[in-house]
Amino acid sequence: MKFSELWLREWVNPAISSDDLAHQITMAGLEVDGVDAVAGEFNGVVVGHVVECGQHPNADKLRVTKIDVGGDRLLDIVCGAPNCRQGLKVAVATVGAVLPGDFKIKAAKLRGESSEGMLCSFSELAISDDHDGIIELPADAPIGVDVREYLHLDDKTIEISVTPNRADCLGIIGVARDVAVVNQLPLTEPDMAEVVASINDTLPIRVDAPQACPRYLGRVVKGINVKAATPLWMREKLRRCGIRSIDPVVDVTNFVLLELGQPMHAFDLDRISGGVIVRLATEGEELTLLDGTKVKLNADTLVIADHQKPLAMAGIFGGEHSGVNEETRNVLLESAFFNPLSITGRARRHGLHTDASHRYERGVDPALQHKAIERATRLLIDICGGEAGPVVDVTTASELPKQATITLRREKLDRLIGHHIPSEQVSDILRRLGCKVTECGSDWQAVAPSWRFDMAIEEDLVEEVARIYGYNNIPDVPVRADLVMTKHREASLSLKRVKTALVDRGYQEAITYSFVDPKVQALLHPQQEALILPNPISVDMSAMRLSLLTGLLSAVVYNQNRQQSRLRLFESGLRFVPDNTADLGIRQDVMLAGVIAGHRYDEHWDLARQPIDFYDLKGDLEAILELTGKLSDVQFRAEAHSALHPGQSAAIYLAGEHIGFIGVVHPELERKLDLNGRTVVFEVQWNKLADRAVPQAREISRFPANRRDIAVVVAENVPAEDILAECKKVGANQVVGVNLFDVYRGKGVAEGYKSLAISLVLQDTARTLEEEEIAATVAKCVEALKQRFQASLRD
C-alpha cells in the first residue's frame, strides 16, 4: 500500500522526521518498502493568473499570454499548451527558476515574440507523467505563492508491505492508529458526522445470503453533477497513493477506500429495476463488467442484483450496465460488509484482482460501514451537489464477526517476551490498541477491537504488547542453557539411520507433495476414499495422499521422461487416511516407501544387463528390517493388492500385524501411468518398526557345527518360508541355521509339486553332538514337515 506522508500526518503528527517515521512504521510491523518524493526538485515556480491569451502571429500552435504573478508588471510568456486560456490559474516558472533535470529558465524569443518564463505541466515538474497540458490550479489559488508550498509538494510517498493479518492497515486510518499508539498521541479523525437526509427517497434492499453479506447499507443521492471537477487536493491525494482520477463519483469512493479501508461502490440509480437484491449467482449467469469483460458466474459467487439481472460481482467488480457515466444524475451508494470466505478466490477465478477484493478477502472492519457511507455522502454532495436520502441498513447481527475476548496471563507474557513490562504499561498499551481491558489481579481480560481480526488468542496479545513496547527496548540477555545429557533408548531406531542405509545401497531420497492427483490416487487405491481439498493449488493437487507411492511413481515417470532409466528412490512422510475414530476424523501415519526401476546394475563391461526383479527390492527391504532386529518376526504373505502384480507381490506382517506391502506394479497400472518397464515398490508403516529389538548377548559355542541336507517334496502352494520356520521351531535347541539352497521342479517330481533342498546346521553350546542326536533331530524335522505340510523326502 502506498500513501502520502502529509495525509497520514493529518490523522496523527508525531514530531519526528520522515526517515524516523518510516523506521517507526517498520518497527511496528509494517515493513516500509520505499520512501519517495512526490515531485522533482525545482524552485522559482509560482501561482500565476492568465490575464490575456492570444494567438501567436507567427505560429498556429503557440499562444502569447500575459501572466500576473503578483509582481509590478505582467509577464509576456509564449505557451503551446492546448488548454491555455484567459482566466486560468497556472504554475509559472519565472526567469531564473530551475526545473527538474537542472533545466534553467531564461528570457528568450520564440518565433519573434519575447517569453519571460514558462507555463508548466505536471510532467515538467516531475509530479506525474501527465504532459497533455499545463497545470490548471483552482480559481482561488493565491497569485504569487510558491507552487511547491501551495500544492504541498514537500511531501513523500511511503509504500508499505501489509501482511495478510493486518487488513486494518489497508487504509490511512489503520496506519495512523499504529503510529498514534507508538507515539502515545491522539488520533485526529476528519469530520464524519451524519448527513441529515434532505429527501425521503430510498431503494428497497433485500439480502438473500446473510451469511455472505451480514451487513449492506444503501443510500440514494439525487441531482448530482458528474461533470463537476474533482478538487485538486483530492486528485493529488489519490495520485500520491497511485490512483488515477476518473470522475468525482469514482474519486470519492476511491478516496474513502484509501482513507478508511472500506470499499464502496456507486450504482446509477436510474438503471436499477425494482430494488437491490444481494444473492448468490445462478450457475452460468452472465455479467458484463465495467471494463467490458463478459464473465460467466458460478453458483458460489455473490452478486448485487436488481429484480431482473446481476449488477455487480459483490466486493470485486461493478457491472457495466449500472455503472456511473456522464449522463448519471442519481446514484445509489453502497457500503457493505462481505464475509471474507464468500469473496476469497472468486476474483482469481476470472483473472481479476481489485482493490476491493484485496481488502474484502482479508477482512474489513464490520463496524466501519456507517462511518464510510456518511463520509462519502458528505464529500459527494460537497463536490457534485445533490440531495441525500436516508441510509437503508440491512444487517443480520448474528452473522457479523464476534469480537474475541482473550485472557492474558502475566506468567505467559513474561515467559514469551523474556522481559518484565510493568502492569500499568501493559494495560495502557492494550487500551491504546483499542481493546476493552479488565484487570484481573495480575492478569488481563481484553476484548479485541472490531478492526483486528488477527487478535484471537493469548499469544496475539503478547505479540501486540511486545510490538508497541518496542522490540528494541527489550534488553539483550544471554541465553542460559543447562547442559543435561539426554537419555538414549537403546531400542530407538532413528529414521535417519534407515535413510543412511538406503543411501548406502544406492537409493536417493525423494520429497514429494502431500497433495496428489485424485485420478492417479484412485488407480492405486480404488476402494479408499481420500480427503479432497476445498481450495487446491491446482486440480492435479487436490487430494491428500493415502500412500507415498502416488508421488514416488509420478517421480519415476518424471525421471524416465528425462532419460533416467535406472532409478532407486525412497521417501518417508505422512499419509492421511479418513478415520472416524481418529482426532478430527483423520489418521496420520508415518510411512516409509521405496521404488526401483530399470536395470540391476549400472552399465559395465563385466556385468550383464539384468532387469530388476521382486527379490532385488525384497533384499533391500530385509536389510532395513534387519536393522530393527525384527526380521525373524516378519512374514511375507502372498495377498492380492489392486495396484500390484498378482503373482509378484506380498503383504508384510510383523508378529501377525499387517504393516505394509511389496511387489511389482500391476501391468495395467504400469500402462496407465506411462511407466517404462518393470517397477517394484514397497511401503511400510514406520511407527511399527521404530522400536528395534535389542540384541541379547549369548555364548558362542566352542564345539563343532554339523550340516545335514534334506530335500522335501511339497505342494506348489506351500511357501518355502513356512518350511524353514517349522524346521527352526522343531529344532529350537540344536538347529542354529536353516537355509533353502535349491528349488527343483521337473523329472521325478509330480506336477503341482516342488522339491526344496534345505541345509540344517546343528550345534550345541555345551558339548559335541553325537551322530545319533543329529539324526534324531533331522528326523523330527522331517516328521514335523510331513504332519503339517504333507511333505515327503525326495528319493
UniProtKB/Swiss-Prot annotation:
Main enzyme class: ligase
RNA-binding recorded as keyword: yes
Chain sites annotated for binding Mg(2+): 454, 460, 463-464
MF (Gene Ontology): ATP binding; magnesium ion binding; phenylalanine-tRNA ligase activity; tRNA binding
Domain B5: from-to ranges: 401-476
Named cofactor requirement(s): Mg(2+)
Stored SMART domains: B3_4, B5, FDX-ACB
FDX-ACB domain segment(s): 701-794
Record carries keyword Nucleotide-binding: yes
Catalytic function, reaction form: tRNA(Phe) + L-phenylalanine + ATP = L-phenylalanyl-tRNA(Phe) + AMP + diphosphate + H(+)
UniProt keyword list: Aminoacyl-tRNA synthetase, ATP-binding, Cytoplasm, Ligase, Magnesium, Metal-binding, Nucleotide-binding, Protein biosynthesis, RNA-binding, tRNA-binding
Cellular component annotations (GO), alphabetically ordered: phenylalanine-tRNA ligase complex
Pfam families per UniProt: B3_4 (PF03483), B5 (PF03484), FDX-ACB (PF03147), tRNA_bind (PF01588), tRNA_synthFbeta (PF17759)
Subcellular location: Cytoplasm
EC numbers, comma separated: 6.1.1.20
Cofactor note: Binds 2 magnesium ions per tetramer.
Annotated tRNA-binding domain residues: 39-148
Gene Ontology BP, a term: phenylalanyl-tRNA aminoacylation
PANTHER family, per the entry: PHENYLALANINE--TRNA LIGASE BETA SUBUNIT, PHENYLALANYL-TRNA SYNTHETASE BETA CHAIN AND LEUCINE-RICH REPEAT-CONTAINING PROTEIN 47
Family label: Belongs to the phenylalanyl-tRNA synthetase beta subunit family. Type 1 subfamily.
Quaternary structure note: Tetramer of two alpha and two beta subunits.
Protein name: Phenylalanine--tRNA ligase beta subunit
Lineage: Bacteria, Pseudomonadati, Pseudomonadota, Gammaproteobacteria, Enterobacterales
